[in-house]
């Protein structure tokens, strides 16, 4: 080393010896910024060690795609020149000279240090810079990445939601994929044109034409479409499919960057090219490479490199085809939701390739279930239907995989369905009705058994495609495209069903007319009401007039008027067709269906006509006698049994006696009624008779006792209380009366703590079960680690210590080696003018193939076909050398210097060869010096932006109306927000703390004092609180927006990037830093980190103590900033809740928000021509508000309620029309009373209830609850704390269990643990919900969900209960249970209930009074009996014929018997007449006439009863349909509240 130190360039340099390499690696780099290490293995072998990037190039050997030279300011720079310019070669020459001198005692220092380095001729190129080149490739790659995300997301969503059903309706598999493909191909071509224009217009690609870029992008886009299809098939979850497609594209596309640095093996390149992002990146690399050398990609160019681009085009086209084939393959092979999928080798079956006509399944007469043929539970089919079996079901079994094992939904079903009949499938919730319909429609596949439709097997795919042409299917759920209008939906599905284009418009008009949808035909489906969506779904099913109609609860959610219209439509279409439907409404099945099939727990119980079922399982007729105190039960019973010995007394109460009479004894009725007419002196006030209903049949089949159906009075009418089964009711009443009283159970502070704990538990459960949210959060944090991982990889690839041996074999051929690329011979140019044999001989001793030429022939630098050349000058005793290198050979200069050094030593007859290697120092602190910290800063930026993924759950609560439901149930806003914060803040703190721990101690490597560590933790806690509260503020302000965590996180990120850039530009000026930390909460923690780095930097530089103390003070000051922000944000939340939040029931003890008093506005309209009962109710409501002392204050008082909405603008230039939803409605609900609100869809029932709850603010009028003289918002401490509210929509959390819902609401309402457990257990037992108690809500049936909502509304014994269509979607058994509970709750005379419903049976069963609404106005109100007396003075005669051919003769006979009879409607064999009261009395004579007519015309059955409220309701609904158009309430528009009413 002393010899080396004599070199001229070593002046001023220090040479330090170390005992070993470890000392050199660890100690010296800390003291010396720039240092060169020399490690000798022996005398002739050594290794040079440099700091990375100081003396050697920053990359390894280049591949052909990387730029080796660049131009700057008119000069050309090449990477390999760094060896020469930065002194690497000088060190090498000095050390080699020293070794030679020590070995040979000859000094060659002058010869070696005077070697001149020359670059060979550089071919023309375009200089763009490597970073720009890589950024260009990355931009090209990600230009379509967002596309594949949205394509995968949309296709997966559409496939999961619509494809199966559209396939059932006749959509072909190819049509589905082609429609999406063509849609996205248009997008791809537009984007490809745009990208090609951009790339060829800006100085990036100069010599490659537009068509090449366009073709590459187009083929890549097509492959991405196919890849999106494949992802949507492989991954069912739309969100995951989109993310998987995006990550697939980015990852494999980034992997394509390896072609910029490595020459991959050909086979590996072809394999990786099966991944289209890799092939695209490689193609772009090829284009830029050829463009760099001024050739570009030009077609046709057979002699050039264009064939490589052609190969890329072919591989991208092949990738597209490859992905499409796998898409179609996995579409058939992967099991669907039911676990059904084709065999993996389905394509080897002959049936797949040849669409031969399958032999139809022949049905023989004896091919019936032997059980059914001998079972009297099944009515034999009349001979006229023999041979008309349209559907044959044989031993159909359907199994599902449940959590506890296999669940049998259907268990060996056998029966036939006949053409020309309407067949109804009946059964309890979960009986298997929908499963059977899904199997018949092809939506599902049976596990075992077979089914045929018109002798065509459903199990054969080819047959199924034929069957679907003739099937119309209405699923249980509404099915339509939300963004299309009603007309457009019908038009689309008409085309899917294959209706001829010429007939589409005519067919659409027919459906609109038949279902009375003219008023909604141009309205977007998303804005339709539930009943209107149901109409549209049914309309889609009957498009094309299919021969087979399969309808799953087609009239669910329809009002009676619409329901009767559907019945008429189906009756008209049943001739020569098959109609099979399911329903929960027994009356609908009784009237509409010719044959009923009962299922129970997946088994077939019975089948037959109504008369057969009623005779088999019915009780018979119900004779109800209303009595007074003079009535002697024994005498009356004896009288009845004289006429009908089989009569049984079923119910006895103080006011009523109910007897069951056998069906076959109707001939005895006239005499019985004649005697009853004479019993007025025995205490009989009036009597009524009703026939057995299918409800009773259903309950008897299920082994349940039934509540007596509402009776139809046929005698002198007085107020009637419907009598229920006294045993069941008394038991239910005992259960409910024993529930704990909760309204005064706890103090405000204790209740607040209990509510906080309940909300925190809720948030924890939601967080634990919302895997999607956690997955997104983990994904974002994972993305934050990507830059660090990439830096690690790049550090490994380009910066990590690598030992490179500079041997001639790197570039030059050996003597016995066959010529191969990229090795060449070494060119020796003799410029000495004499013989240089000694030098040549010494060079050959190094096993190098030489090519010797004279300088006069070539100078050695003009021919870049050689990897390197040595130009020899001087004379034999004093050689001088110049070395010329090919600019693409990065390590050429060190190799040639080694060759020259060994040649000189060989001249002195020494055979040893000097071997030199190069490596670099690997130091931890080099990371800071070289910017490795940038990746970790990115990690901190992302971490500070993830609070929206944690703190925005309130948006989903708001959109599901759960939040308002909690407020109505008594939850305080402060308890809600603080309860959420108890979970969100610790979670976010753990994330922040963990990431900062990693950042400080792993990436930065500096140690914090315990004091600073404590301050850091305090600051992190404050920032976690501040950012979570900020997120709460944003979620409140933008709660009506879509919950978009990613959008807000990205917004935070952009803000942080901008602020960080400003901080860097201002050199972290203290004032700017503090201001940004104060006003930008997401930057607070990052600014704190910057201060800590600054402090650590000052300590390392031994800065003055006063400067360090100043920074310490700043750090302590900034620690208080997030806590100040937290207080401000919490106050903002309080202000928002006070101004714009949901109405609260009582004063919030923390936010100090009092219930707001409503501003009552005078009603803009005066009532005109009101019914006298409605007018009396208005006066009573007004008196309840103004009278100082009332004997009995109503529980609910609604006075002059008026509600107006504004329609949404249809265009920018249109004006908003005002719609009136509620018009001058007044009513009172008394203590111990159930008031029913009935009305057509859109009549204003739900709006009325929402105004009472405070969810909707009335435009005018006032609501008073619990007798308060002010509004409900001004309650005192001794008044109600919460309402019992069951909304029309199920406001539930899908992933929480039923038990968790009940426990949450019990805590919110103030129940203690023991009381809550007692209440829950008793209510669950009363409604038979034990099996569903631990099941997630999303797995429950609609009926069970309604039960849960109902239980939540009555939990805690509220004094005011509001029920908005609570019994929708429930089977008769469930309805009976809820009716019993509701009746038992009102036994408490302090409690009042308001109920809305569409169904008269519900209202008559549970309501004390009813009010009917039409177009937002109250048309009538009163007790059930009062309304019957007032509007139902006529009688209804229904006759069911056995032979429809007798219609005319029968009609003539009826007019003879009842001259004023009016023919109402006719459903096939059912005839209905309205009879005036004078034609009917006396009833005994009327029944005598009917009995005689029954015998004469062989009638199946008849019933005579007073006109029901159903008919009254239908008449009023017709008024709404035909009313004033301007006044009609259109619920199909998305109304916007008046400006002053909602923020």
UniProtKB/Swiss-Prot annotation:
Please list the GO terms describing molecular function.
ABC-type transporter activity; ATP binding; ATP hydrolysis activity; ATPase-coupled transmembrane transporter activity; lipid transporter activity
Taxonomically, the superkingdom here is Eukaryota
Q: Segment Disordered: which positions?
A: 1153-1177
Positions binding ATP 2 in this chain are 1239-1246
Renumbered to this chain, the Basic and acidic residues biased-composition regions fall at 1153-1164
Q: What is this protein called?
A: ATP-binding cassette sub-family A member 10
Task: Give the intrachain disulfide bonds.
Answer: none
Q: Does the keyword ATP-binding apply?
A: yes
Spell out the SMART domains in the cross-references. Answer: AAA
Q: Where is the ABC transporter domain?
A: 391-626, 1206-1440
Q: Where is the composition biased (Acidic residues)?
A: 1165-1174
């Amino acid at each position: 080393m002393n010899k080396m130190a004599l070199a001229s360039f070593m002046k001023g340099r220090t040479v330090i010896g170390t005992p070993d390499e470890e000392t050199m690696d660890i100690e010296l780099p800390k003291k010396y910024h720039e240092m060169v290490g020399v490690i000798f293995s022996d005398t002739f072998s050594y290794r040079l060690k440099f700091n990375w990037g100081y003396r050697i190039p920053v990359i390894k050997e280049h591949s052909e795609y990387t730029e080796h030279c660049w131009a700057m300011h008119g000069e050309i720079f090449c990477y390999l020149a760094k060896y020469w310019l930065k002194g690497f070669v000088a060190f090498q020459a000095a050390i080699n000279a020293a070794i030679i001198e020590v070995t040979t005692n000859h000094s060659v220092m002058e010869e070696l240090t005077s070697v001149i380095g020359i670059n060979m001729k550089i071919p023309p190129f375009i200089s763009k810079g490597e970073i720009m080149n890589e950024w260009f490739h990355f931009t090209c790659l990600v230009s379509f990445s967002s596309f594949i995300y949205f394509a995968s997301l949309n296709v997966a969503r559409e496939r999961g939601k619509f494809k199966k059903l559209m396939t059932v309706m006749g959509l072909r598999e190819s049509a589905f994929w082609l429609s999406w493909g063509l849609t996205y191909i248009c997008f791809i071509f537009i984007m490809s044109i745009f990208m090609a224009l951009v790339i060829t217009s800006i100085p990036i690609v100069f010599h490659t034409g537009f068509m090449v870029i366009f073709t590459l992008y187009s083929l890549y886009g097509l492959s991405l479409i196919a890849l999106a299809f494949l992802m949507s098939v492989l991954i069912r979850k739309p969100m995951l499919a989109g993310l998987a497609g995006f990550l697939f594209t980015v990852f494999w596309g980034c992997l394509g960057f390896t072609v910029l640095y490595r020459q991959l093996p050909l086979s590996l390149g072809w394999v990786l090219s099966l991944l289209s992002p890799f092939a695209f990146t490689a193609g772009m690399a090829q284009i830029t490479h050829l463009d760099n050398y001024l050739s570009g990609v030009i077609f046709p160019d057979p002699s050039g490199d264009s064939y490589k681009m052609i190969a890329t085009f072919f591989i991208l086209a092949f990738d597209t085809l490859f992905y499409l084939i796998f898409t179609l393959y996995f579409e058939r092979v992967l099991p669907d939701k039911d676990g059904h999928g084709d065999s993996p080798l389905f394509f080897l079956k002959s049936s797949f390739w040849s669409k031969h006509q399958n032999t139809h399944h022949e049905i023989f007469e004896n091919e019936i279930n032997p059980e059914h043929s001998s079972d009297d539970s099944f009515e034999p089919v009349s001979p006229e239907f023999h041979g008309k079996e349209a559907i044959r079901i044989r031993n159909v079994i359907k199994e599902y995989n449940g959590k506890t094992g296999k669940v049998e939904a259907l268990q060996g079903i056998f029966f036939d369905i006949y053409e020309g009949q309407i067949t109804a499938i009946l059964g309890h919730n979960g009986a298997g009705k929908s499963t059977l319909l899904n199997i018949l429609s092809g939506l599902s596949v049976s596990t075992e058994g077979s089914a045929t439709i018109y002798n065509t097997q459903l199990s054969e795919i080819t047959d199924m495609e034929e069957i679907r042409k003739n099937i119309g299917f209405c699923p249980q759920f509404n099915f339509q495209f939300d963004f299309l209008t009603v007309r457009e939906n019908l038009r689309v599905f008409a085309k899917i069903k294959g209706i001829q284009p010429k007939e589409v418009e005519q067919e659409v008009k027919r459906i609109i007319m038949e279902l009375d949808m003219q008023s909604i035909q141009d309205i977007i489906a998303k804005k339709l009401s539930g009943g209107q969506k149901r109409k549209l779904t049914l309309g889609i099913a009957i498009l094309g007039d299919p021969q087979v109609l399969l309808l799953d609860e087609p009239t669910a959610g329809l009002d009676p008027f619409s329901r009767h219209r559907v019945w008429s439509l189906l009756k008209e279409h049943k001739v020569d067709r098959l109609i099979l439907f399911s329903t929960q409404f027994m009356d609908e099945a009784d009237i509409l269906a010719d044959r009923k099939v009962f299922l129970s727990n997946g088994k077939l119980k019975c089948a037959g006509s109504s008369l057969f079922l009623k005779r088999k399982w019915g009780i018979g007729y119900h004779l109800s006698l209303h009595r007074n105190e003079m009535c002697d039960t024994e005498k009356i019973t004896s009288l009845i049994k004289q006429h009908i010995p089989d009569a049984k007394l079923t119910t006895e109460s103080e006011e009523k006696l109910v007897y069951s009479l056998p069906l076959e004894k109707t001939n005895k009725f006239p005499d019985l009624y004649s005697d009853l007419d004479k019993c007025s002196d025995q205490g009989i006030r009036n009597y009524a008779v009703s026939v057995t209903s299918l409800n009773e049949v259903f309950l008897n089949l299920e082994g349940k006792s039934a509540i007596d159906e509402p009776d139809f009075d046929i005698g002198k009418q007085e107020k009637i209380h419907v009598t229920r089964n006294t045993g069941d009711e008394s038991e239910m009443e005992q259960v409910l009366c024993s529930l704990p009283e909760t309204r005064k159970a706890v103090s405000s502070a204790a209740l607040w703590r209990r509510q906080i704990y309940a909300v925190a538990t809720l948030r924890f459960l939601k967080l634990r079960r919302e895997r999607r949210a956690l997955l997104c959060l983990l994904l974002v944090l994972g993305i934050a680690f990507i830059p660090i991982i990439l830096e690690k990889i790049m550090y490994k690839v380009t910066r990590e210590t690598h030992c490179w041996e500079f041997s001639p074999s790197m570039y030059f051929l050996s003597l016995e080696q066959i010529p191969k690329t990229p090795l060449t011979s070494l060119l020796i140019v003799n410029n000495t003018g004499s013989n240089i044999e000694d030098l040549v001989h010494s060079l050959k001793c190094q096993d190098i193939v030489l090519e010797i030429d004279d300088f006069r022939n070539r100078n050695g630098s003009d021919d870049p076909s050689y990897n390197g050349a040595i130009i020899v000058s001087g004379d034999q005793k004093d050689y001088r050398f110049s070395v010329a290198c090919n600019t693409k050979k990065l390590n050429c200069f060190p190799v040639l210097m080694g060759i020259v050094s060994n040649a000189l030593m060989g001249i002195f007859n020494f055979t040893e060869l000097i071997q030199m290697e190069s490596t670099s120092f690997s130091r931890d602190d080099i990371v800071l010096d070289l910017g490795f910290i940038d990746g970790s800063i990115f990690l901190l930026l992302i971490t500070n932006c993830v609070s929206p993924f944690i703190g925005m759950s309130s948006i989903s609560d708001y959109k599901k109306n759960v939040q308002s439901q909690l407020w109505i149930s008594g939850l305080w806003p402060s308890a809600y927000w603080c309860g959420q914060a108890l979970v969100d803040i610790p979670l976010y703190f753990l994330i922040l703390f963990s990431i900062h721990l990693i950042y400080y101690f792993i990436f930065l490597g500096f140690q914090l004092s315990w004091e600073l560590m404590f301050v850091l933790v305090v600051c992190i806690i404050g920032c976690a609180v501040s950012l979570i509260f900020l997120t709460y503020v944003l979620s409140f302000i933008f709660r009506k927006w879509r919950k978009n965590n990613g959008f807000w996180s990205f917004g935070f990120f952009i803000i942080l990037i901008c602020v960080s850039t400003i901080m860097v530009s201002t050199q972290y000026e203290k004032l700017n830093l503090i201001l940004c930390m104060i006003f930008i909460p997401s930057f607070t923690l990052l600014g704190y980190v910057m201060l800590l780095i600054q402090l650590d930097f000052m300590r390392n530089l031994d800065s003055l103590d006063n400067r360090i103390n100043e920074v310490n003070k700043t750090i302590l000051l900034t620690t208080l900033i997030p806590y100040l922000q937290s207080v401000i944000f919490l106050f903002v939340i309080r202000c928002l809740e006070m101004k714009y939040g949901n109405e609260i029931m009582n004063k919030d003890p923390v936010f100090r928000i009092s219930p707001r008093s409503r501003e009552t506005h005078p009603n803009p309209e005066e009532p005109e021509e009101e019914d006298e009962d409605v007018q009396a109710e208005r006066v009573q409501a007004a008196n309840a508000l103004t009278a100082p002392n009332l004997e009995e204050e109503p529980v609910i008082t609604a006075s002059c309620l008026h509600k107006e909405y504004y329609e949404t603008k249809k265009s920018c230039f249109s004006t908003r029309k005002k719609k009136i939803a509620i018009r001058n409605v007044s009513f009172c609900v008394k203590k111990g009373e159930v008031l029913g609100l009935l009305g057509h869809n859109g009549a204003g029932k739900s709006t009325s209830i929402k105004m009472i709850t405070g969810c909707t603010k009335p435009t005018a009028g006032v609501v008073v609850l619990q007798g308060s003289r002010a509004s409900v918002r001004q309650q005192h401490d001794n008044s109600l704390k919460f309402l019992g509210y069951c909304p029309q929509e199920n406001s539930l959390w899908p992933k929480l269990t039923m038990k968790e819902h009940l426990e949450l609401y019990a805590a919110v309402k103030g129940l203690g643990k023991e009381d809550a457990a007692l209440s829950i257990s008793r209510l669950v037992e009363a409604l038979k919900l034990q099996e569903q108690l631990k099941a997630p809500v999303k797995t429950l049936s609609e009926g069970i969900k309604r039960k849960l909502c109902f239980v939540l509304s009555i939990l805690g014994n509220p004094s005011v209960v509001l029920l908005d269509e609570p019994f929708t979607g429930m089977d008769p058994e469930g309805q009976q249970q809820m009716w019993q509970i509701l009746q038992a709750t009102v036994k408490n005379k302090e409690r009042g209930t308001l109920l809305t419903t569409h169904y008269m049976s519900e209202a008559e069963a549970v309501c004390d009074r009813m009010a009917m609404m039409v177009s937002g106005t109250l048309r009538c109100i009163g007790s059930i009996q009062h309304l019957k007396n007032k509007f139902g003075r006529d009688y209804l005669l229904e006759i069911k014929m056995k032979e429809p051919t007798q219609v005319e003769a029968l009609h003539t006979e009826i007019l003879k018997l009842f001259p004023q009879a009016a023919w109402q409607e006719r459903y096939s064999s059912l005839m209905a007449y309205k009879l005036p009261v004078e034609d009917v009395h006396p009833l005994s004579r009327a029944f005598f006439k009917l009995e005689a007519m029954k015998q004469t015309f062989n009638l199946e059955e008849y019933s005579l009863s007073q006109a029901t409220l159903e008919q009254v309701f239908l008449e009023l609904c017709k008024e709404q349909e035909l009313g004033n158009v301007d006044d009609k309430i259109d619920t199909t528009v998305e109304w916007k509240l008046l400006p002053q009413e909602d923020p």
